[in-house]
């Protein structure tokens, strides 16, 4: 029997936002879970890994002098495979994995690993992306660094640190700006890395049912957010889609938009299909799988969420409308 895939949390955030402090808090908490940590540092000599509370981590793997968001994603796959192999042999025990990215990482390609690689998907399940936001410096970072925008736009949770260093008005303005970039991610204030475990682990960010339960406004396609250069929009329809037309449109859109599309996810109803189909896309990789049958008491409604850099929203909405069954 195949083991249940281990949940994975991607912990990201710009330089100095407090990721390692948060990770130490999680490792010290008495939650009873064994955590394997993959620590990515953009330097030959790892410093952050030396600051991690080692007794709380089952295994710490350090990836030095590289950024897992770009050229060495293959190294990440090899590390994950090694962790899974050692667990299967009884050499290592862990319940979940936390990947702490470098502050300069775009989390989208990291998440893509768990969508595109079949062996990784069989052994690991991406639970969510948690982004730390430095309240004192986030405004400047969002203005000057595309990576900071991507980290906020891709998040399933936004944890705001250093709020004690700014005034109430400045904090309120930042939270408003963050909602503009990513209205779907709940925001939490974190003091000295002390976050609720449920805000970091088991966020179920890639579980569409969980999203619908947590955020009933997720269904509302009136919400459109285009601030900074990262934005999101939601498309919904009670009319079923034509499968061939939608697949062709999505393939063309992902080819045209490319890496500007950070993430898409959704639940789709197709004409003539009793299955509820789940779409997950990260950059140029798209998967679609029948999740289960639509329930008789369930409203058959398609909901698609798109997050990306300068997305052509109106053109995409029109394209999606043309994919509806006639």
Question: What are these language model-derived features?
Answer:
Residues 2-17, 21-141:
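Nucleotide-state-sensitive switch-loop elements of NTP-binding domains
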Residues 40-41, 56, 94, 128, ...:
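Residue-level signal for alpha-helical context at structural boundaries
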Residues 28, 35-36, 89, 110, ...:
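A generic "cationic amphipathic patch" detector
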